[in-house]
Curated annotation (Swiss-Prot):
One BP annotation, GO: glucose metabolic process
Subunit note: Monomer.
Pfam families: PGM1_C_vert_fung, PGM_PMM_I, PGM_PMM_II, PGM_PMM_III
Residues with Phosphoserine modification: S123
Cofactor, free-text remark: Binds 1 Mg(2+) ion per subunit.
EC class name: isomerase
Identification of the protein by name: Probable phosphoglucomutase, cytoplasmic 1
UniProt: alpha-D-glucose 1,6-bisphosphate binding residues: R24, S123, D303, R304, T367, E386, S388, K399
Places the protein is found: Cytoplasm
Cofactor list: Mg(2+)
Species assigned in the record: Arabidopsis thaliana
GO MF entry, a single one: phosphoglucomutase activity
Keyword Cytoplasm included in the entry's annotation: yes
Catalytic residues in the record: S123
Length: 583
């Protein structure tokens, strides 16, 4: 059949400004007439013609509720805009890191390469009819659209008058692998449904020594548990951990992708990954039995990770520092060295200490993976990470949850080369972390999240903190009045970043109070929630003395926490006596 293209009249819809990772709203908002269509067309209009006409696009996501409807709408709009091919992961499933890998690595049967992707995800936000949906666009390098593009998309949403769509194009069966071909006014249009794991698994096997990891997993001394929280990581977990690496099926937890993530919150932290946390011996009550040696979890779209040892939590800030410190010896991909390392500004300075010690280039960037992407494209950065459970490398242009798990497995395999056979005790996750602290010092670190705060009140709190910064002597008077047992503030500012690659400047990236002993308080408003504002407070204290690195984090940070809450007048502005989540 030859499909026809019709033009639908529309008008701008307020609030379609993409955040750090696309547009996220409640499903009911996306289901409003023209809501999704306006945003998709605004994106097409923001791209240059060669990225649309005759191009190959990837459309997939984490499988959350409304994805199946959204994919069909985007296919019809892509056809109408002159796109030549759309690649879809079977059942709309492709993890965010796998989308990046597909853009960068995959070639079609005719040699075609993808120029970009619509990723349907709200990441770690809940899914279901009353929960969140999201969409973001990734570029031909496999990374999220830069601000120059997202700003253009937003401007386009404010002026849009119409969009083309191939309404008579039948829905494509996305449950079966294969190619469906159509004829349109501009010639052929193909939709190819493919296995979501193939390209990604191939890439992982080129990075890590699967044989070494397989050997570790085959040891009766090594036990392992992976929790996909019913997100898209489940589409990869069986293939990688069971089929390729020989783990037991019983090692996989919640690995069936579900539209509503099984009613849970697909955010891999100590609050939401309750089942894994209990199994690893970190729950409030003892589950009985010996916990596994190693545990890990993913979020909805599998770009985030949480790393756990037996009764031991690894902070994301420590995780990226430990991966960087061990990458050259443990991971074949890095055997010839690291080009540089980078972290987001709120992430602890543990990575800075490793970079200094190993004489590596180091970068501190705003929150948002696109900033790392620029450094990687310029060959300046190999390993990077964020405190928000995101870790990755230059193999793709997104953070990558399964990559981080394989990196940790590689480090464990490397450290236990001589211990796998025989009676020798395995070097544990906790051993590796404590040894790291003994070598580099420890950054005590915690994050307080205040979710769904009244946006006006959140803004007032931030303005109060900026105003305080105008006089450091005055700030120190207030600080000493609150707590005499903390160091003095050395400097305070609003973080601003000048990209060393393209010279672009990002302002208002978080409020910082930097103390004379290396401690930090950071306050940020987050752009990833779908309702209200989220205030994130980051508290960090550096301890170089190896004999003092074994304290409980909350105990060590207690004076700084007290100071942060009183200095910011948190309860006064928000009405909250406690945070929603403590990490």
């Amino acid at each position: 059949m030859v499909f026809k293209v019709s033009t639908v009249s529309t008008s701008p819809i307020d609030g379609q400004k993409p955040g750090t990772s696309g547009l996220r709203k409640k499903v009911k908002v996306f289901k409003q007439p023209n809501y999704l269509e306006n945003f998709v067309q605004a994106t097409f209009n923001a791209l240059t013609a060669e990225k649309v006409k005759g191009a190959t696009l990837v459309v997939s996501g984490d499988g959350r509720y409304y994805s199946k409807d959204a994919v069909q709408i985007i296919i019809k709009m892509a056809a109408a805009n002159g796109v030549r091919r759309v690649w879809v992961g079977k059942n709309t499933l492709l993890s965010t890191p796998a989308v990046s890998a597909v853009i960068r690595e995959r070639s079609g049967a005719d040699g075609s390469k993808a120029t970009g992707a619509f990723i349907l995800t709200a990441s770690h936000n809940p899914g279901g009819p009353t929960e969140d949906f999201g969409i973001k666009y990734n570029m031909e390098n496999g990374g999220p659209a830069p601000e120059s593009i997202t700003d253009k998309i937003y401007e386009n949403t404010k002026t849009i008058k119409e969009y083309p769509i191939a309404q008579d194009l039948p829905n494509v069966d996305i449950s079966a692998v294969g190619v469906t071909s159509f004829e349109g006014p501009e010639g052929k249009f193909d939709v190819e449904v493919f296995d979501p794991a193939d390209d990604y698994v191939k890439l992982m096997k080129s990075i890590f020594d699967f044989e070494a990891i397989r050997k570790l997993l085959s040891s009766p001394k090594f036990t392992f548990c992976y929790d996909a929280l019913h997100g898209v990581a489940g589409a990869y977990a069986h293939r990688i951990f069971v089929e390729e690496l020989g783990a037991q099926e019983s090692a996989l937890l919640n690995c069936t992708p579900k539209e509503d993530f099984g009613g849970g919150h697909p955010d891999p932290n100590l609050t939401y990954a309750k089942e894994l946390v209990a199994r690893m011996g970190l729950g409030k009550s003892d589950t009985g039995g010996e916990p596994p040696e190693f545990g890990a979890a993913a979020d909805g779209d599998a770009d985030r990770n949480m790393i756990l040892g037996k009764r031991f939590f690894v902070t994301p800030s420590d995780s990226v520092a430990i991966i960087a410190a061990n990458a050259i010896g443990a991971i074949p991909y890095f055997s010839s060295g690291l080009k540089g390392v980078a972290r987001s500004m709120p992430t602890s300075a543990a990575l800075d200490v490793v970079a200094k010690s190993l004489n590596l280039k180091f970068f501190e960037v705003p929150t948002g993976w696109k900033f790392f992407g620029n450094l990687m494209d310029a060959g300046m950065c190999s390993v990077c990470g964020e405190e928000s459970f995101g870790t990755g490398s230059d193999h793709i242009r997104e953070k990558d949850g399964i990559w981080a798990v394989l990196a940790w497995m590689s480090i464990l395999a490397h450290k236990n080369k001589g211990n796998i056979d025989g009676n020798a005790k395995l070097v544990s996750v906790e051993d590796i972390v404590r040894q790291h602290w003994a070598t580099y010092g420890r950054h005590y670190y915690t994050r307080y999240d205040y979710e769904n705060v009244d946006a006006g009140k959140a803004k007032e709190l931030m303005e109060h903190l900026v105003k305080l910064q105008s006089s450091i002597p005055e700030v120190n008077k207030i600080v000493k009045g609150i707590r005499s047992d903390v160091a003095s503030v050395a400097s305070a500012d609003e973080f601003e970043y000048k990209d060393p690659v393209d010279g672009s400047i990002s302002k208002h990236q978080g409020i910082r109070y930097l103390f004379e002993d290396g401690s930090r308080l950071v306050f940020r408003l987050s752009g990833t929630g779908s309702e209200g504002a989220t205030i994130r407070l980051y508290i960090e204290q550096y301890e170089k003395d190896a004999s003092k690195t074994g304290r409980e984090s909350q105990e060590a940070l207690s004076p700084l926490v007290d100071l942060a809450l009183k200095l910011s007048k948190m309860e006064e502005f928000t009405g909250r006596s406690a945070p929603t989540v403590i990490t």
